[in-house]
C-alpha cells in the first residue's frame, strides 16, 4: 500500500474514535454519542478496514450505511473519497472530500485526506495547503503524519528545502517517525552523504516492520560507505524476505541507482 494512503487510513480509523478531535463537531455538547453517531462511527471504521484490505465494494456499502445514520458525517465522506480515489473515479472522490470540508472545514482528517488525494494526483502545491490546514487544530492527534505527507509532496515538486523543513518538524514531534527518517535518509543518500543517511537509518526503531525499500536504501548506504560485509548481509535479507520485489530484481541486476 502506498505510504500516503496508508497514513490516511490510519488517521481515519483513529479519527473515528470517540475521543478523537476529528469527530468533536459531531458529538453532542454533553460529549455523549447519540445512537446514530455510534452507528455512523462503527460503519465508517468498517469501511476504512475494508478499504485497507482492498475490498472496495464492501467499503462503499459500509460508508453508505454510515451516511444513512448520520448524513453529514465527515469521516464517512473522507472514507468515500479515499475509496473513489482508489477506484480512479477522481470526480466523485473530490466531491466527497470537498463535501466533508464544507461540513467540517477544521476537521484535520478531512484536510489530510484531501491533501493525500491531491498529492497522488500530482497537484502537490494544492495538497500542501490542506496538510498545513490539518495542522492548525491544536488537538490533532497525529500531526507528524501531515508533516511527513507535506514533506513527501514538497519533495515531489523538487523543493528539497521545504521537504527537509517538514520532515524535521515531524521528527521534532516524534523522533522515531519511520517515514520521516526514511525520507531524510534517502535525501542524504541522494546527496552522497552516506554517513548522515546511515545515522537516520539507525534512528529507526528496531521493531519497525522492514520493507524492501528500507533494506534497499540501507544496502546502498553501506555500499557507499564501503562496508561490504554489511552490504552483503542486507542483500541476503532483501533476497530472502522480498524475492519478487523490484528492489531485489535491481540488486540481482546490479542496478544500484
Task: Show which residues each predicted segment covers.
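Register position in tetratricopeptide repeats
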Residues: 52, 86-87, 120-121, 156-157, ...
Amino acid at each position: 500500500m502506498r505510504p500516503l494512503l496508508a497514513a490516511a487510513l490510519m488517521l481515519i480509523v483513529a479519527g473515528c474514535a470517540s475521543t478523537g478531535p476529528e469527530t468533536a463537531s459531531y458529538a453532542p455538547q454533553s460529549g455523549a454519542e447519540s445512537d446514530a453517531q455510534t452507528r455512523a462511527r462503527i460503519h465508517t471504521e468498517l469501511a476504512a478496514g475494508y478499504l485497507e484490505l482492498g475490498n472496495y465494494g464492501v467499503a462503499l456499502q459500509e460508508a453508505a450505511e454510515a451516511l444513512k445514520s448520520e448524513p453529514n458525517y465527515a469521516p464517512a465522506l473522507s472514507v468515500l473519497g479515499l475509496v473513489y480515489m482508489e477506484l480512479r473515479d477522481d470526480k466523485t472522490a473530490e466531491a466527497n472530500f470537498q463535501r466533508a470540508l464544507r461540513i467540517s472545514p477544521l476537521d484535520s482528517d478531512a484536510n489530510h485526506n484531501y491533501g493525500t488525494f491531491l498529492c497522488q494526483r500530482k497537484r502537490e502545491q494544492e495538497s500542501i495547503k490542506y496538510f498545513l490546514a490539518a495542522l492548525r487544530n491544536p488537538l490533532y492527534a497525529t500531526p507528524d503524519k501531515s508533516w511527513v505527507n507535506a514533506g513527501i509532496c514538497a519533495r515531489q515538486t523538487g523543493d528539497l528545502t521545504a521537504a527537509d523543513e517538514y520532515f524535521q518538524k515531524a521528527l521534532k514531534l516524534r523522533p522515531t517517525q519511520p517515514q520521516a527518517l526514511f525520507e531524510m535518509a534517502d535525501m542524504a543518500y541522494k546527496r552522497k552523504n552516506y554517513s548522515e543517511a546511515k545515522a537516520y537509518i539507525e534512528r529507526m526503531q528496531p521493531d519497525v516492520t522492514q520493507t524492501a525499500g528500507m533494506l534497499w536504501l540501507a544496502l546502498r548506504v553501506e555500499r557507499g560507505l564501503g562496508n561490504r560485509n554489511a552490504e552483503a548481509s542486507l542483500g541476503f535479507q532483501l533476497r530472502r524476505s522480498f524475492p519478487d520485489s523490484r528492489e531485489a530484481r535491481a540488486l540481482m541486476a546490479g542496478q544500484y541507482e
